[in-house]
Amino acid sequence: MASELDGLPVIATRREEAEGFLQGLVSKSLGWARKYSLFTYPFVTACCGMEYMTMASARYDSDRFGAAMPRFSPRQADLLMVVGTVNCKQAPILQRVYEQMADPKWVMAFGVCASSGGFYDNYATVQGIDRVIPVDVYVPGCPPRPEQVLDGIMLLQKKIQNQSHKLIDRTPLPVISGGAGR
């Protein structure tokens, strides 16, 4: 494995190649594990909530896609499902919920109202939640069918699996001796 650094060839050692291989393997394993363990937090505001409940029922079984039970706190979730219309008074609340989620986090806009404001084109409605928070997957429909939502979850799973998952550096910090005890 050779690369260029200021015009001079740099040859990686076998150890560096092995570390790169292991990091890639661990990153792929993390992607595989994360894609099947989505902890959802629903932000339900409108009529699409009925289809959200249908999608979570036994007939469609969202558990087999790794998006089982909704969490009761955004701190426990990594997938925010914005279901329905968001008005201007709710936008700061939605922003706060998004900020409370732990990294990595993903957002799904559930329905036309969450994606683009729907047919509510007035001063009080946010014309798409992407004006407030970043969105990873848009699920169209008024309301979207449960099959469409499951397709959106599978699309998000592919995106999660293909992302690079950084490892946390756990090198110990140096111990500073001295102080009051000396």
Swiss-Prot record:
Keywords: 4Fe-4S, Cell inner membrane, Cell membrane, Iron, Iron-sulfur, Membrane, Metal-binding, NAD, Quinone, Translocase, Transport, Ubiquinone. It is a peripheral membrane protein. GO terms for molecular function: 4 iron, 4 sulfur cluster binding; iron ion binding; NADH dehydrogenase (ubiquinone) activity; NADH:ubiquinone reductase (non-electrogenic) activity; quinone binding. Its cofactor is [4Fe-4S] cluster. Binds 1 [4Fe-4S] cluster. Its main location: membrane. [4Fe-4S] cluster binds at C47, C48, C113, C142. Pfam families: Oxidored_q6. It is found in: Cell inner membrane. GO terms for biological process: aerobic respiration; electron transport coupled proton transport. GO terms for cellular component: plasma membrane; respiratory chain complex I. Its EC number is 7.1.1.-. It catalyses: a quinone + NADH + 5 H(+)(in) = a quinol + NAD(+) + 4 H(+)(out). HAMAP family: NDH1_NuoB (MF_01356). Belongs to the complex I 20 kDa subunit family. NDH-1 is composed of 14 different subunits. Subunits NuoB, C, D, E, F, and G constitute the peripheral sector of the complex. NDH-1 shuttles electrons from NADH, via FMN and iron-sulfur (Fe-S) centers, to quinones in the respiratory chain. The immediate electron acceptor for the enzyme in this species is believed to be ubiquinone. Couples the redox reaction to proton translocation (for every two electrons transferred, four hydrogen ions are translocated across the cytoplasmic membrane), and thus conserves the redox energy in a proton gradient. NCBIfam families: nuoB_fam, PRK06411.1, PRK14817.1. This is NADH-quinone oxidoreductase subunit B. It comes from Anaeromyxobacter dehalogenans (strain 2CP-1 / ATCC BAA-258). The gene is nuoB.
